[in-house]
């Protein structure tokens, strides 16, 4: 009787341990690897295709630095319109990555712009395009003939305040 009980318990434990392993495998396989490519670090995945890199410094109304979050990359699609409202939304996500729900965006620096640098195959030289941040926004250009992963960079100061 004791041997049967131990055998039953062993089989039961094996079943539970295998079910937890298969759950972990299925959870890791649900990550959409098609949108990202693996970088040098195993925990870092670089977006494939165009992306917006937000690298901002949060300051108060007097220019004193309040927050300097790590940069964050957001996948974007060619043909998408990036308005000031959308960009502020991405900036708030970057702030939340460091201090979740503590700050809100008051205003972007008036001189803020988004830049992309790539090698133009037609002109055979480096090109830098700048896009102003406006209410109307700008359409993300398709640069796929020149570069696989164009990085549209927003590097600026942002006026923020506590929520």
UniProtKB/Swiss-Prot annotation:
<keyword id="KW-0964">Secreted</keyword>
<comment type="function">
    <text>Potent plasminogen activator that converts plasminogen into plasmin. It forms a 1:1 complex with plasmin, which in turn activates other plasminogen molecules.</text>
</comment>
<comment type="similarity">
    <text>Belongs to the staphylokinase family.</text>
</comment>
<dbReference type="InterPro" id="IPR036120">
    <property type="entry name" value="SAK/SK_sf"/>
</dbReference>
<protein>
    <recommendedName>
        <fullName>Staphylokinase</fullName>
    </recommendedName>
</protein>
<dbReference type="InterPro" id="IPR004093">
    <property type="entry name" value="SAK"/>
</dbReference>
<dbReference type="GO" id="GO:0005576">
    <property type="term" value="C:extracellular region"/>
</dbReference>
<keyword id="KW-0732">Signal</keyword>
<keyword id="KW-0617">Plasminogen activation</keyword>
<dbReference type="Pfam" id="PF02821">
    <property type="entry name" value="Staphylokinase"/>
</dbReference>
<feature type="signal peptide">
    <location>
        <begin position="1"/>
        <end position="27"/>
    </location>
</feature>
